[in-house]
């Protein structure tokens, strides 16, 4: 572990050492494969990026100097190391903003990054308080880490980046003078008011009116129908009431003759309680102050039995048995998704395409050597495209990019939307870097008196002026190219570029076409049947010294498809007598531009003509599908927008994805089945509506009467298939006992199949039938009866709608800001993504709402911060109004039910299961005829297999029967392995993985993106595929030690996994246990307890450390959730996951404590009423070893 100015390396750096080599990083041979391609490259890239900050280069507004980073790996990401890392880098007396970013491999095996939503302000006053704050922060970080990695289906975590900013000066003038402790964050639920409403101080908790005080006798009118007067101390109370009503513009109140009045006194304050009967068992009550002011009205009491009654105040109803609360119900008013209908009278035809080509420069970084664009109007002329080449049109990549952008911004091509395939992952990095560099050059010229103007004749004119004075520098400091972007998940979806001209502003917009057509360009061209198809090009042939190459055609080794060299037959078609790189590049570039343009134009016309929807108004295929659904299919249906934070958090906890499991790792004569449009099919089931109420009962809720999302205790019946998912570093389907949130219909399915479900609380919804039936049926019919582009478009629309409802409710704002502005935002707003694009500019995506919690954590005054942002509109829409997580959670649950029922039927019919993914099953028997076919929701037989190897989720090899080889492009195998090149694997390697239990090597591609320097390098490297990577089920071995089957993991409420039928505990080669220990990191090492979780005693590491049992802990969690304080609830939950000590009582009262940080167990007992450490012991393979006189003895106590 070594500090290098701004970066610390933890974890795997235990094997890594710094030396005076080029990169300063060495690693042991046993770790070489790890460092070769994953962590080492990550560390080295950042090391190079942050390496040298000599004093002459330091600038106060440099982002590189403002943001420091600490890197940790996942295996050693512990609370202990986290605290030490911050202690080593943070200085007492400072204020810091801390963010956490994770680098991981996604479900396709590609490197990706995400910012955890755990941003925190930390004031370092003294060491002890600081450590407590950091402990609490780690708990928040770890929960976010687990949730995000599960949400993004991460296959492997490569590194955790702790980013911190010294923020002593940001908003210093608004700092609070006395802050001695952290304040808890509360959701927007009026907990205090609800407590007050239902307290004895408001109204006695009984329906017996003798406890309401002295009954008063009113005066009635002559017909004895209404009360005219009620004199109290000589004053007519009825007149006071109606005078107050008139003053407050409320209705005149008539009390009928049956109204009863009581004078009630509490804490020296007097009230008047009125009681009116609605029925024999129901009364409504109103409470007035003696001034006539209506303090609380419409209190509805209902007698349920002689002892039990319910009281409703506002939207809350509570049932009481004496003074005990036995049931709660809170009605929630949910907004609904509304259609903002805007009919279009004409198709937006101002569209174009953009693309660029790169090569490796002398620094081995990618640089642009050709680029161009086309528009619909241009494509109809002889010119067709406008393209630039490095050696012909400019001397540098920067120069030709700026020339191209300037032409696009000219009067002929302005106001166009330019589609670029993979804009966010590639092209935009080069564009942004060039524009920011050009802005800097133009500003420097302005200060020298040289002004740059873009004229309508497309030329740039330079006018000499007097140098700008210091007084005018600020007003002249505006960027020449004004840039705005929209980010999502660390990728740019849209980029708008504007320049000021004498006649106003010229603007162009870049949109990533991959997000609305998620497939490779060559595949799209074939499906759309474009006139111009994407060609083949020898990318690796292009180098600095070949840019002007003219000669023979490059050799066949340079022409590849998916990293595989093309056939000789195909290569022969590419040979030409004189091969000119510039001409070939521009020809290839033009084909790409025109091919994509034709695809977009066809797409644009199709959705406009069929649905009257503009393609250009959608940045993603999911948004386009939603626009079509809302416009054509929503009708009178009411879909709720879940904006309430507690409700959103609870339903999000019940939102699980698809299940990918290996059951048997190897088999012969198998069938591979896929479901036809699984999610659209199950979306035709009954869906949650917009009427919602929170319900909770001390006696438990009856599952058969429920529909919605509920928190429950689950106890399984230990069968071969797990039926309910659990988030635990991915999705597992275990046996055991735990608590969790689930969709009611999935709970009913589990209960029918033997699970014991105790429902504790949750959200009851009304039911909507046929919400998506018309949409699904129409699009599936079109898909089934069409081909080419229409079939592909319909497929995308059909499969993309439902996931859109599961988006986060919070809108993000994306800006390019100065470093100082970014630092201020880090103090007040939660950051989603941040990238340095120059020394002084930051591309930042953040939640628009100023966070009171974050502000106060930094020791600032929230109200004064709001006042300092005078243009801020607190009521401005900061949330999406068209997302409904309840829909997405229900759809995915219905899909799991459907797949689980099919798997149970296979087992019931004598079949075996080998592998399953979200919508596919591999088995050794034929499915019944009624389940197989081409209809929606039926299975299709994708392949018959001679053999199948299933090593892990999404890592398998299928050897096909002869009649299915042609269907597979004349290949006899189907290989899949987490994003690696399929050509780097073969059957023999899978045999080594399975039969020989040997790891194998494969090749995968990674993108190294550098916004600051403006390049993206696509690199290939060797990775290891682990033979024992699968840990989502417990493995079963034959007598020869060969893995032959699996069973569910055993999962307990404390998140401790226990393999109850593993090999003998004293076996040194306990593979199951080792796998589970590895699986459960970085949470804690596995400890096996013979006792029930309810017998555990937990050590609570607070300022006043104490021991509590599990029931007390559950009570604390529930109380925090009831009080809508999720921060406290999550913090307590983390004590189960990674607390300082876990312990339980022995027979003699001795406590056994396990410390994950020290990796030791301590036995403590009371001696003179003090807890003391008696023996130092170790834990191995299920046994405790006691250290005595430097030797360890087996402990059997």
From Swiss-Prot:
Keywords: DNA replication, DNA-binding, DNA-directed DNA polymerase, Mitochondrion, Nucleotidyltransferase, Plasmid, Transferase. Gene3D superfamilies: Helix hairpin bin, Palm domain of DNA polymerase, Ribonuclease H-like superfamily/Ribonuclease H. It is found in: Mitochondrion. GO terms for cellular component: mitochondrion. It holds the Pfam family DNA_pol_B_2. It catalyses: DNA(n) + a 2'-deoxyribonucleoside 5'-triphosphate = DNA(n+1) + diphosphate. One of its GO terms (biological process) is DNA replication. It is an enzyme of class 2 (transferase). Its main location: mitochondrion. GO terms for molecular function: DNA binding; DNA-directed DNA polymerase activity; nucleotide binding. Its EC number is 2.7.7.7. This DNA polymerase requires a protein as a primer. Belongs to the DNA polymerase type-B family. This is Probable DNA polymerase. It comes from Podospora anserina. The lineage of its organism: Eukaryota, Fungi, Dikarya, Ascomycota, Pezizomycotina.
């Amino acid at each position: 572990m070594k500090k290098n100015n701004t970066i610390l390396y933890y974890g795997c750096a235990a094997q890594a050492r710094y030396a005076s080599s080029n990169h300063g990083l060495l690693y042991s041979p046993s770790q070489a494969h790890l460092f070769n391609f994953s962590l080492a490259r990550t560390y080295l890239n950042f090391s190079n990026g942050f390496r040298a900050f000599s004093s002459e280069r330091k600038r106060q507004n440099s982002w590189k100097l403002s943001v420091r980073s600490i890197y940790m790996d996942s295996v050693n990401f512990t609370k202990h190391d986290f605290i030490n890392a911050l202690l080593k880098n943070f200085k007492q007396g400072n204020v810091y903003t801390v963010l956490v970013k994770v680098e991981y491999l996604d479900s396709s095996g590609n490197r990706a990054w995400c910012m955890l939503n755990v941003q925190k302000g930390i004031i370092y006053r003294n060491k002890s308080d600081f450590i407590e704050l950091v402990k609490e922060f780690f708990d928040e970080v770890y929960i976010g880490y687990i949730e995000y990695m599960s949400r993004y289906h991460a296959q492997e975590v490569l590194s955790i980046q702790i980013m911190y900013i010294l923020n002593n000066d940001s908003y210093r003038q608004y700092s609070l003078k006395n802050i001695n402790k952290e304040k808890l964050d509360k959701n927007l639920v009026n907990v205090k008011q609800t407590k007050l409403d239902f307290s004895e101080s408001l109204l006695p908790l009984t329906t017996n009116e003798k406890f309401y005080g002295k009954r008063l006798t009113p005066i009635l009118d002559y017909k004895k129908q209404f009360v005219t007067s009620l004199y109290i101390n000589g004053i007519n109370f009825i007149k006071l009431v109606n005078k107050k009503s008139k003053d407050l513009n409320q209705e005149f109140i008539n009390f009928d003759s049956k109204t009863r009045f009581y004078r009630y006194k509490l804490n020296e304050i007097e009230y008047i309680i009125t009681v009116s009967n609605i029925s024999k068992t129901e009364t409504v009550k109103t409470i007035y102050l003696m001034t006539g002011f209506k303090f609380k009205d419409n209190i509805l009491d209902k007698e349920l039995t002689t002892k039990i009654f319910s009281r409703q105040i506002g939207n809350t109803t509570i049932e009481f048995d004496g003074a005990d609360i036995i049931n709660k119900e809170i009605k929630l008013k949910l907004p609904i998704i509304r259609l903002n209908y805007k009919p279009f009278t004409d198709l937006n035809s101002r569209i174009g395409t953009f693309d660029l080509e790169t090569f490796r420069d002398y620094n081995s970084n990618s640089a642009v050597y050709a680029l161009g664009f086309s528009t619909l109007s241009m494509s109809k002329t002889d010119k067709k495209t406008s393209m630039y080449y490095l050696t012909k049109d400019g001397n540098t990549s920067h120069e030709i990019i700026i020339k191209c952008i300037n032409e696009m911004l000219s009067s002929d091509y302005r106001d166009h939307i330019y589609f670029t395939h993979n804009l966010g992952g590639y092209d935009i990095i080069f564009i942004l870097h060039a524009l920011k560099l050009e802005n800097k050059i133009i500003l420097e010229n302005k200060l020298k008196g040289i002004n740059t103007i873009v004229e309508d004749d497309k030329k740039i004119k330079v006018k000499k002026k007097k140098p700008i004075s210091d007084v005018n520098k600020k007003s002249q400091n505006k960027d020449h190219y004004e840039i705005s972007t929209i980010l999502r998940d660390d990728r740019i979806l849209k980029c708008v570029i504007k320049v000021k001209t004498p006649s106003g502003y010229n603007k162009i917009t870049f949109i990533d076409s991959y997000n609305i057509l998620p497939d490779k360009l060559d595949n799209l061209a074939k499906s759309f049947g474009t006139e111009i198809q994407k060609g083949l090009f020898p990318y690796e042939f292009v180098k600095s010294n070949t840019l002007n190459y003219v000669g023979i055609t490059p050799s066949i080794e340079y022409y590849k498809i998916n990293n595989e060299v093309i056939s000789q037959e195909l290569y022969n078609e590419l040979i030409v007598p004189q091969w000119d790189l510039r001409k070939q590049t521009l020809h290839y570039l033009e084909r790409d531009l025109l091919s994509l343009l034709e695809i977009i134009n066809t797409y644009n016309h199709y959705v406009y003509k069929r649905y009257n929807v503009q393609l250009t108004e959608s940045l993603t295929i999911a948004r386009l599908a939603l626009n079509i659904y809302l416009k054509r299919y929503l009708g009178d249906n009411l879909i709720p927008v879940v904006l309430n934070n507690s409700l959103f958090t609870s339903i999000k906890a019940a939102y699980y994805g698809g299940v990918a499991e290996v059951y048997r790792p190897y088999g012969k004569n198998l069938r591979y089945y896929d479901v036809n449009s699984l999610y659209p099919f199950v979306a035709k089931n009954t869906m949650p509506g917009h009427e919602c109420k929170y319900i909770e009962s001390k006696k438990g809720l009856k599952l058969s009467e429920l529909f919605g999302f509920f928190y429950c205790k689950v106890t399984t019946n230990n069968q071969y298939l797990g039926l309910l998912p659990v988030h635990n570093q991915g999705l597992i389907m275990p046996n055991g006992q735990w608590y969790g949130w689930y969709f009611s219909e999935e709970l009913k399915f589990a209960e029918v199949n033997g699970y014991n479900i105790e429902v504790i609380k949750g959200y009851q919804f009304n039911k909507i039938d046929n919400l998506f039936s018309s949409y699904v049926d129409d699009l599936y019919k079109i898909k089934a009866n069409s081909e080419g582009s229409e079939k592909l478009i319909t497929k995308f629309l059909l499969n993309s709608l439902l996931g859109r409802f599961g988006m986060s409710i919070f809108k993000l704002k994306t800006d390019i800001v100065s470093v100082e502005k970014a630092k201020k935002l880090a103090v007040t707003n939660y950051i989603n993504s941040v990238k340095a694009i120059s020394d002084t500019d930051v591309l930042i995506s953040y939640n628009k709402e100023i966070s009171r919690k974050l502000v106060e954590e930094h020791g600032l005054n929230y109200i004064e911060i709001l006042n300092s942002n005078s243009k801020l509109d607190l009521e401005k829409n900061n949330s999406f109004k068209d997302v409904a997580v309840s829909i997405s959670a229900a759809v995915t649950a219905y899909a799991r039910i459907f797949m689980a029922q099919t798997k149970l039927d296979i087992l019931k019919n004598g079949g075996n299961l080998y592998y399953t993914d979200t919508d596919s099953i591999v088995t050794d028997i034929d499915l019944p005829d009624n389940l197989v076919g081409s209809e929606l929701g039926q299975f299709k037989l994708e392949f018959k297999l001679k053999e199948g190897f299933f090593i892990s989720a999404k890592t398998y090899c299928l050897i096909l029967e002869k009649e299915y080889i042609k269907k597979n492009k004349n290949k006899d195998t189907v290989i899949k392995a987490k994003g690696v090149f399929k050509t780097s694997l073969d059957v023999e390697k899978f045999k080594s993985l399975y039969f020989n239990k040997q790891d194998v090597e494969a090749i995968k591609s990674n993108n190294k993106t550098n916004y600051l320097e403006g390049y993206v390098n696509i690199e290939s490297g060797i990775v290891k595929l682990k033979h024992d990577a699968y840990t989502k089920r417990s493995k079963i071995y034959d007598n020869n030690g060969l893995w032959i089957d699996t069973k569910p993991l055993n999962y307990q409420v404390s998140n401790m996994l226990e393999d109850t039928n593993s090999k003998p505990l004293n076996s040194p080669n306990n593979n199951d246990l080792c796998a589970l220990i590895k699986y459960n990191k970085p949470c804690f090492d596995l400890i096996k307890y013979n006792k029930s979780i309810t017998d555990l005693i937990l050590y609570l590491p607070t300022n006043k450390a104490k021991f509590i049992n599990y029931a007390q802990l559950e009570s604390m969690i529930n109380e925090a959730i009831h009080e809508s304080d999720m921060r406290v609830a999550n913090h307590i939950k983390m004590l189960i996951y990674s607390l300082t000590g876990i312990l339980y009582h022995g027979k003699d009262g001795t406590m056994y404590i396990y410390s994950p940080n020290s990796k030791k167990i301590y036995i403590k007992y009371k001696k003179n009423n003090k807890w003391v450490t008696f023996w130092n012991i170790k834990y191995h393979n299920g046994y405790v070893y006691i250290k005595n006189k430097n030797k360890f003895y087996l402990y059997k106590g």
